[in-house]
Amino acid sequence: ALRETVRISDQVQVMTELAVRNLSSGKWDPGPIEGREAKTDRLTREVVDYLAELRRRTHEQNDATEHLMLVATELENMGDQVRRLYRREQRLKKEGIEFSEQGRAELVATAELVQERMRLAFTALATGDLQMARQVIDGRKPLEEHVARMRLAHLARLEERLLESRASS
């Protein structure tokens, strides 16, 4: 189950890399993202079903299986977020609206920070490196602070009445 969960993380990692690249350019190719998202959904279902069956058969409610189930479903949610970002930008484009230059740059910078943190987390998961896992946990607060600053910057653009900022809220 751990190996399959790592495979899920590999799919999500590539989806995130594609999203950062596409977000940066404003040009999306949905094919690779949708294909990986479908694979992520299938793998997640298989991992969760396997672990649930294992827990039923052994009547064992151990932390390791519970954590793997949570990790797998969170990874699936991350993949869903990439798809939502793509669909959001496509919807805006149909309305003739693009992210503001500053907003796009902030989204890309934030996505790159998240991506780097994901790499660290996925490596910690795959290797069982506790020190690396601690780095991931310790990096949570700085990332949350960065996201809070980006939200405030977005609100400032809303106050400036930028059409792109209002439409992308």
What is each PLM-predicted segment?
Residues A1-S169:
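Cytosolic, long alpha-helical scaffolding segments
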